[in-house]
Amino acid sequence: MSDALINGLAGAGGGIIAQLLTYPLQTVNTRQQTERDLKREKRKLGTIEHMCQVVKQEGWERLYGGLAPSLAGTAASQGVYYYFYQVFRNRAEATALARKKKGLGDGSVGMFASLLVAAFAGSVNVLMTNPIWVIVTRMQTHRKMTKDQTAAPESPSSNAEALVAVEPRPYGTFNTIREVYDEAGITGFWKGVIPTLIMVSNPSMQFMLYETMLTKLKKKRALKGSNNVTALETFLLGAVAKLGATVTTYPLLVVKSRLQAKQVTTGDKRQQYKGTLDAILKMIRYEGLYGFYKGMSTKIVQSVLAAAVLFMIKEELVKGAKLLLSNATSS
């Protein structure tokens, strides 16, 4: 079994577990990002308050809205990403060794090369899995109709604040697929792909930071006669790497969520986005810079925890798989 396949499967497994543990936070964060309160008069709910409100008004199950396609998307995304990451990484390492033989470089993959490797893998992943995340975003932001919400809204702003989906229950995966297709055709499944492609810099930064810190840690251990990195150390390295990447690219994530969520159908043009640039300009004009950082504290907690768990489990799965393969080969 190739290293690329081992890393792909391990990444998928780690991603699923991380997703299960942090999904309620992800749902709350997506809802926070897609709030369209232009006047900003209301006090914003904290993460725990928002979560309790969802449970009280809509039930526990809404915290896990879109979980099934999300798990499929996580497995696909992590599998595709890690597979192509390892493929491109192997080529980069081979190129570095070839350059060393010619007297150029020390044979190691530099920071810039690591960034390119992660960017290429991320771009392939985005183009292949974007339709899944459009569906997940729709399901996370869909809200159950209450008796008060079934009446006609008093104003466009109240409709926008609620972001109430008009489809009847149940609102499952196939309902969502039909809604997206009816609204924008096949291209609707690639809404938000431009900011998402730009956001490739997030995992690129994440893996660049992670690989750099991991390499330095291993070198320090090698000087002491050991090359082992503990699960806790991997957890902490993953958390630090994700924190740096998330803070840098968060505004693009908000734009992506706005584009992928169900568009407000009122006559208020301020809340209807024609594309990425239109969304950015309207958010700047009507919400200010604040609009680009809605729910950021929730996202930091969710993404850092998920990334730390993912890295820890992925590395342990890779170690276990290689150990099993080596034992099978020796026997």
Swiss-Prot record:
GO cellular-component term (any): glyoxysomal membrane
Transmembrane annotation, as ranges: 5-25, 63-85, 116-136, 180-200, 235-255, 293-313
Record family assignment: Belongs to the mitochondrial carrier (TC 2.A.29) family.
Primary gene name: PXN
Protein name in UniProt: Peroxisomal nicotinamide adenine dinucleotide carrier
Compartments where found: Glyoxysome membrane
Solcar repeats: 2-91, 109-216, 229-320
Tissue/organ expression: Expressed in cotyledons, hypocotyls, vascular tissues, trichomes, hydathodes, seeds, pedicels, flowers and stigma.
Gene null: resulting phenotype: No germination or growth inhibition, but delayed storage oil mobilization. Decreased sensitivity to 4-(2,4-dichlorophenoxy)butanoic acid (2,4-DB), a precursor converted in vivo by beta-oxidation into the herbicide 2,4-dichlorophenoxyacetic acid (2,4-D). Enlarged peroxisomes.
Gene Ontology terms describing biological process: NAD transport; regulation of peroxisome size
Assembly and interaction partners: Homodimer.
Gene3D superfamilies hit by this protein: Mitochondrial carrier domain
Taxonomic lineage: Eukaryota, Viridiplantae, Streptophyta, Embryophyta, Tracheophyta
Mode of membrane association: Multi-pass membrane protein
UniProt KW keywords: Antiport, Glyoxysome, Membrane, Peroxisome, Repeat, Transmembrane, Transmembrane helix, Transport
Alphabetized SUPFAM superfamilies for the sequence: Mitochondrial carrier
Main localization (coarse): membrane
UniProt GO MF annotations: antiporter activity
Organism annotation: Arabidopsis thaliana (Mouse-ear cress)
Activity control: Inhibited by pyridoxal 5'-phosphate, bathophenanthroline, tannic acid, mersalyl, mercuric chloride and bromocresol purple.
Function statement: Mediates the NAD(+) import into peroxisomes. Favors the NAD(+)(in)/AMP(out) antiport exchange, but is also able to catalyze a low unidirectional transport that might be essential under special conditions. Transports CoA, dephospho-CoA, acetyl-CoA, adenosine 3',5'-diphosphate (PAP), NAD(+), AMP, ADP and NADH, but has no activity with ATP, GTP, GDP, NADPH, NADP(+) or FAD. Required for peroxisomes proliferation.
